[in-house]
Amino acid sequence: RRLVEKDHPSNVEFPGYFKGAVFQGAMTGADAFFFPSYEETEGIVVLEALAGHQHVVLRDIPVYHGWVDDQSAELCHSVDEFVDSLEKVLSGQVDKRDAGYRVAQSRSIDLVADQLVKAYQQVLEM
């Protein structure tokens, strides 16, 4: 908690500690969304970053397989890869924001709801 509240560079923000319009502004106004976590349950925060047209730099972990790939985000395995990816993103050498946004669109709540309705209809027809 001390790191989040005091001991970090002034250009670093921790999204879990602000909400609403402030969160939306941070997600759309940041230079990049950097999420090096070893664990993630569903990837909702990543989906939010993709929907906000962010440059996304992630650790390549299984929860993202099948929906986030190297076309839509920078996927890394080591500190050196994270440094390299962040440098490429921040210097403008790579820009995967449009592809990332398409991933977010493909997982929109409306599309997911339609899929759920179809699944229920199939079960009812059995």
For the regions a language model picked out, list residue spans one by one.
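A charged, aromatic-enriched C-terminal amphipathic alpha-helix characteristic of glycosyltransferases
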Residues: 94-124
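Nucleotide-activated donor-binding/catalytic signature segment of Leloir-type glycosyltransferases, i.e.
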Residues: 1-18
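Short glycine/serine-rich donor-binding loops of glycosyltransferases
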Residues: 43-46
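Aromatic "clamp/platform" in nucleotide-sugar-dependent glycosyltransferases that forms part
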Residues: 38
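Short hydrophobic beta-strand element within catalytic cores of glycosyltransferases
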Residues: 51, 55-58
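Short alpha-helical donor nucleotide-sugar binding micro-motif in glycosyltransferases
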Residues: 17-18, 25-30
